[in-house]
A protein has these predicted regions:
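Primarily recognizes the serine-hydrolase "nucleophile elbow" in alpha/beta-hydrolase
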Residues: 127-201
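Conserved alpha/beta-hydrolase "acid-adjacent" motif
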Residues: 213-219
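Short beta-strand/loop motif that positions the catalytic acidic residue
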Residues: 206-208
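N-terminal cap/lid segment of alpha/beta-hydrolase-fold proteins
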Residues: 1-55
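C-terminal catalytic histidine-bearing segment of alpha/beta-hydrolase fold enzymes
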Residues: 227-275
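Alpha/beta-hydrolase active-site loop
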Residues: 108-147, 257-260
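Short amphipathic alpha-helix adjacent to the substrate-entry channel of hydrolases
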Residues: 75-93
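Short beta-strand element of the alpha/beta-hydrolase
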Residues: 57-66
Length: 275
């Protein structure tokens, strides 16, 4: 199945965000591993991938790729996720959220930044409120235009991977009435912006691999927090998979994680039978 034609939607109205000093051009780039990514997002967008109307369920998922806040791994944590969701009647909206700006030394600088916790903290801490705002605005925008896209306004969720998991989990902790996700799925998530579990916290689907020390710690911590708050939560931990597997097929049980997600959606009434 090919992805249908898709619409790129600016996340914010003109002039709503301050881009002063954000001078690096957004572009496709490659990591030293050969991974194709997007870097230097200054103007956040949502890209709409809508399922065939004959199988559309009315459910929507905002998909947030990861990339250490320096880039977006937009294929195996973005468009490939959207393709699978569309095949199962689910509308997908890939979020390009704001990133650390990088220059001519990309991708070498990514490794240097990741090797220094102090340097990473200095770079990403100022970014956190911006990406949280992007996550909340994504939910708000999809809900505002739900009728246009054939989406049920009470079945709009958010999913993210690694840094995109941070966007997802932060959104699930720090929303207002217009930006509350109906469900959230942080996949091997980085630590979120804090805050107590809200009184009306959405159902949470957490997933990671045990051989991913960072994400397994975050996942178990927020499983406990949701449980202690009496909110619906499910946690899957695969013994192997590492960090960043996304839709890559590794010959491991983690290859089928997205099927577990769909089962969870059905169990909670977010995914009715397809037409």
């Amino acid at each position: 199945m090919n992805l249908p034609s898709h619409q790129v939607i600016p996340l914010w109205p003109d002039g709503a965000i301050d881009t002063t000093g954000w001078n690096q051009p957004e572009e496709i780039a490659y990591l030293e591993s050969g991974l194709k990514v997007i870097r230097n997002v200054v103007h956040p967008t949502l890209t709409a991938y809508l399922p065939d109307p004959s199988i559309a369920t009315g459910t929507a998922v905002i998909v947030c790729p990861g990339g250490a806040y320096h880039f977006l791994a937009f294929e195996h944590e973005g468009t490939e996720v959207a393709r699978w969701l569309n095949e199962h009647g689910i509308a997908a909206f890939m979020l390009k959220y704001r990133l650390v700006q990088t220059g001519e030394d990309f991708p070498q600088c990514v490794g240097e930044h990741l090797s220094s916790r102090q340097k990473m903290k200095k770079l990403v801490d100022p970014l956190f409120p911006l990406v949280l705002a992007d996550g909340c605005q994504a939910v708000r925008l999809v809900r505002t235009r739900a009728a246009e896209w054939g989406i049920a306004p009470d079945r709009i969720g958010i999913m993210g991977f690694s840094a995109g998991g941070m966007v997802t989990l932060s959104t699930a902790l720090n929303y207002d009435a217009s930006s509350r996700p109906d469900f959230a799925a942080p996949i091997y998530s980085a630590p979120p912006m804090g805050g107590p579990v809200p009184a009306d916290a959405p159902p949470l689907f957490l997933l990671c691999a045990a051989d991913d020390d960072m994400a397994s710690g975050v996942s178990t911590t927020y499983y406990k927090k949701w449980r202690e708050a009496g909110k619906p939560v499910e946690l899957h931990i695969y013994s192997k998979g590492g960090h960043g597997f996304g839709m890559n097929q590794l010959g491991l049980p983690s290859d089928h994680w997205i099927e577990r997600f769909a089962e969870w959606l059905k169990a909670h009434g977010f995914l009715p039978e397809s037409k």
